[in-house]
Regions:
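N-terminal Rossmann-like or analogous alpha/beta NTP/dinucleotide-binding catalytic cores
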Residues: 1-97, 195-207
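Short histidine-centered catalytic/ligand-binding loop motif
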Residues: 184-188, 237, 384
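Glycine- and acidic
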Residues: 13-18, 179-185, 233, 399-401, ...
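Active-site cores that bind ATP or allylic diphosphates and position pyrophosphate for catalysis
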Residues: 71-74, 79-214, 220-226, 259
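Helix-rich, typically C-terminal accessory recognition domains appended to large enzymatic cores
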Residues: 392-439, 443, 452
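Long, amphipathic alpha-helical coiled-coil segments characteristic
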Residues: 365-400
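Catalytic adenosine-cofactor/nucleotide-binding cores of aminoacyl-tRNA synthetases and other
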Residues: 205-359, 364, 368, 423-459
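Residue-level signal for inorganic ion chemistry
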Residues: 1, 32, 72, 76, ...
């Protein structure tokens, strides 16, 4: 909705649709506000900022819906229904032919005006149903799916106003979309089947229908739609798992929409400028967590270092208790290696304390190292580093590279053992020089000595 509005110089309106009291969720409105704020999707009108067509909370517009429902009754396009729940339940069980109930049988359509008034005067509960045509067809146009035609005989006399005085979702939306001058109605393709009823409501009032844009479903896999009830992640879940809001927005924008080129990374501003309805697809999209994770990693890599540090600082402080370590240096190492912010604790825990590790880590085919080579390299590196008076990354680099030349070995045959001894991990953010610089001289020498001892014990 947001991109369609902005790409056509329109307004993006926030309307709280809370007329279904059975599905009302406490705190849901706050989640909507928080999500819009985090994603940068700024609405032009809404409950919090007002606008020309308020109020923007449907439960505050209750008087409006009943008036329009009664107008339809007067026009002959709707009617009162006094059927009890027991009668409707019995109807659902079977009809006269023993078939499963699929449509209301219009029992109350034939009530006389006197009977209707008598029931109303007696305070009998009622709903208001839309009177559907029983012959002919209804056709509507959808931007994505084209012209769709249904047989009117298949349409049920849907409820417009419920017995509790609240409008149904379908009816309230038609009324509010018209009154708020909504030009584009954007929703999931599962609502295609109810759109003929919308179209007939617009026709009954003599209003122009909006432009319909039905979007394909987002799937967990080839057979199942995404569903929070089945454990699929919400936006809040993704953020709590270390995904960036802008990366999630970017990825979701690409589900069911293809840009004119092969570009995959867009800022919100770029999406607003290049989005085009013509790029929407009919085919369902599969929510690929691996693709989102890759995209998130690209966003992290492309951030400026200061912005990344601000983002990562709290996680670094929670993960690393040693306050003498330079967290900014650690952040610089991490930035090019992270996929999500929640990877941080796992990647930095060795800075606090050296984990227990196997000497198998010293064996690396590509680096051409064995346990014997690793032991020899660490023994050679120890005195060189001990004699280093000015402990900086540059000086550590020069000292170790000079030692490589002296020993006549490959770079990796020295640097891999030193890196392994310093981290105790199969992989680490940063190599031997960076880790030694951050850990400091005393801790680095201590860990190298532990590495030597471990190797001596197995050789």
């Amino acid at each position: 909705e947001y991109l369609i509005a902005k790409s056509q110089n329109g307004k993006f309106i926030l309307r709280i649709e809370d007329t279904d009291q059975e599905r009302f969720v406490e705190g849901a409105t706050e989640i909507i506000y928080n999500t819009l704020n985090m994603t940068g999707l700024k609405h032009d009108e809404g409950p919090d900022i007002g606008g020309e067509y308020g109020p923007y909370i449907q439960s505050q517009r209750m008087g409006i819906y009943m008036d329009y429902a009664k107008e339809l009754i007067e026009k002959g396009n709707a009617y009162y229904c006094f059927c009890t729940k027991e009668r409707l339940d019995a109807l659902k069980s079977s009809n006269d032919k023993g078939d499963a109930f699929s449509k209301y049988d219009r029992h109350c359509l034939t009530l006389s005006q006197e009977e209707i008034q008598k029931n109303l005067d007696a305070g009998m509960p009622f709903v208001i149903r839309q009177k559907m045509p029983t012959e002919g067809t209804t056709t509507f146009h959808d931007v994505v799916y084209g012209d769709i035609t249904v047989e009117n005989a298949e349409l049920d006399d849907q409820i417009l106003m419920k017995a509790d005085g609240f409008p149904t979702y379908n009816f309230a939306n038609v009324i509010d979309d018209h009154l708020m001058k909504i030009t584009h109605v954007v929703r999931g393709s599962e609502y295609l089947s109810s759109t003929p009823k919308y179209k007939l409501l617009y026709d009954a009032f003599g209003w122009e229908s909006p432009i319909y844009v039905h979007l394909p479903a987002v799937m967990r896999d080839a057979h199942n739609k995404l569903s929070k009830r089945h454990g699929d992640k919400s936006f809040e879940d993704l953020i709590s798992e270390g995904y960036l809001p802008e990366a999630v927005v970017n990825y979701i924008a690409l589900l069911g929409w293809s840009p004119s080129d092969n570009k995959e990374i867009f800022s919100l501003k770029e999406l607003e400028q290049c989005f085009n309805i013509s790029g929407l697809s009919k085919s369902p999209s599969i929510f690929d967590m691996k693709k989102l994770t890759w995209l998130n990693g690209e966003y992290i890599k492309n951030m400026d270092t200061e912005s990344f540090y601000i983002l990562a600082e709290n996680r670094l402080k929670n993960a690393i208790k040693n306050t003498t370590l330079d967290l900014k240096k650690i952040a610089t190492l991490l930035q090019k290696r992270l996929e999500t912010l929640n990877d941080i604790p796992r990647l930095v825990d060795f800075f606090d304390s050296l984990p227990e590790y196997s000497t198998d880590l010293y064996v690396h085919k590509k680096m051409k190292t064995t346990e014997e080579i690793a032991l020899s390299s660490l023994k050679a590196a120890l005195p060189v580093l001990e004699n280093l008076s000015d402990w900086t990354e540059s000086n550590i680099h020069d000292a170790l590279m000079s030692l490589v030349q002296t020993l006549g070995i490959k770079n990796g045959q020295l640097l891999w053992p030193v890196r392994t001894a310093l981290s105790g991990e199969p992989t680490s953010p940063g190599g031997a020089m960076e880790l030694a610089d951050i850990l400091g001289k005393e801790e680095s020498l201590k860990r190298i000595k532990i590495g030597i001892e471990k190797l001596q014990n197995v050789l």
